[in-house]
Amino acid sequence: MKRFLHCVSVLLLFELAFSSTDTLHYDVTVFGIRCGKIFYSSEKENISITALSSGLIEYFYPFKNDYHTSFDTLTFGIRSYKKTVKQGDFKQRLSGKWDSSTEEFTYDNFDSFKRADSCMTIFTLLERLNRENPEKLDTKWFPIEHEGSLYRSRVLLAGTEKILINGDSIVSNHLRLDLIPDDREIKMLDRSDYFSQNITHSESIKQIWVERKPSGKILKASVKIGPITITATITNK
């Protein structure tokens, strides 16, 4: 059950990070049973995300997580971050800002971390994929700031596929995301929400199907941890 909850939480936010400027809705399912829903909206330099439990999971593990990120529209480097998490009995708030004068990202009530101007987060990286042609980013490495830890990230273009969405066959780019930790980093938090804690899990296999340009929004995604695969599918294409 714990591994199942990890997968659900990871995919909920992972799927959110791909979308257009409209508010998009996604259903998340495991074994064909809906367990969560996602609301995502982005403006020019801001991303707002809400993930909610639904279906059977609402009865034994309700959650409502809000994430807000601002970023540089040229480099997609993080400028500010705020999250408010409620997962069962666990609650957490975290916020921080990037200081251009010191090139540090400082978390309120926590430490400061030296980060380059172009250092992204998982959310801004995925938003970048939403706005740019994945072929231009294929196999390239980028630094990722993640709650005080530094990672190297890359997307791998696995090919072009047709997937079925609401009865329509749509051509999409099939991507895989890799995240590799910098071993010199020490974890800032003893505990975090399931998404933040497990998106970097060494065993998680993250795959995304993004509609080919011009719209570029994500159509479907899957996250696999161990034997469990969770799938998210857009509902308001």
Regions found by a protein language model. Give the residues of each.
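Acidic, serine/threonine-rich low-complexity disordered tracts
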Residues: 20-98, 143-237
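Generic secondary-structure transition motif, activating predominantly at the C-termini of alpha-helices
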Residues: 9-12, 127-134, 159
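Sec-dependent N-terminal signal peptides
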Residues: 4-16
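Extracellular and organelle-lumenal recognition/adhesion modules and their flexible linkers in secreted
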Residues: 1
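Small/flexible residues
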Residues: 4-5, 117, 154-156
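Hydrophobic, well-structured mid-protein blocks that either form specific transmembrane helices
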Residues: 94-136
